[in-house]
Swiss-Prot record:
One Pfam family, short name: HcgF
Protein name as annotated: UPF0254 protein MK0012
Similarity comment text for this entry: Belongs to the UPF0254 family.
Length: 182
């Protein structure tokens, strides 16, 4: 059984929830629109964490992320896009290692497009949203970016689960792939 853990910021834990719904065979309102029941009995969610703050990243994941460019009124970190990409990788790797999962998924978005990372210790996939938004200036783009981030995270995980990485890499939103081959 494939074990997955998520450390999520702008996707608010919904990626882990959707994977769990599919793995549990939930249908209807409880089910996953994107994954269906494809993962039933084949995947286990070790943890699905919503971690919007730097202090949360430090205490829960044991990482030392860069200081945020800005901080929201609620204390949420707000990095610019380039730093979000680096932090998403840190989050995915740390949640995988910390929980003993086979796969870690990290998502974060502050100012710009959202960053999505999937890491299994050998393969690191880095994707992004197309939607630009600013966490410090909330408007409808925040929600659009979140929904696209959830969908793309699930599409990325599904491609990984199905061993369809070559097809995934044809998507323009998958920015980087690192394969550490023996």
């Amino acid at each position: 059984m494939l074990r997955v853990a998520t450390a999520e910021c702008f996707t608010h834990g919904f990626v882990g929830r959707e994977i769990h719904a599919s793995a549990s065979g939930y249908t209807g309102e409880l089910g996953s629109e994107i994954l269906g029941t494809e993962l039933e009995g084949k995947v286990s969610v070790v943890a699905a964490c919503f971690i919007p703050t730097v202090s949360g990243l430090r205490s829960l994941l044991g990482i030392d992320p860069p200081e945020p460019d800005e901080v929201s009124k609620s204390g949420a970190k707000a990095y610019r896009e380039e730093t979000d990409r680096k932090v998403a990788v840190m989050m995915a790797r740390a949640v995988r290692e910390r929980t003993g999962a086979d796969v870690g998924i990290g998502t974060t978005a502050g100012i710009g497009r959202g960053a999505i990372c999937l890491d299994d210790g050998e393969i690191t996939l880095l994707g992004r949203t197309d939607v630009h938004a600013n966490l410090l200036k909330p408007d409808e783009r925040i929600r659009k970016r979140q929904l696209q981030g959830i969908k793309r995270s699930l599409v990325m995980f599904r491609a990984y689960f199905r061993c369809e990485l070559d097809e995934l890499l044809e998507e323009e939103w998958v920015e980087e792939v690192t394969r550490d081959l023996p």
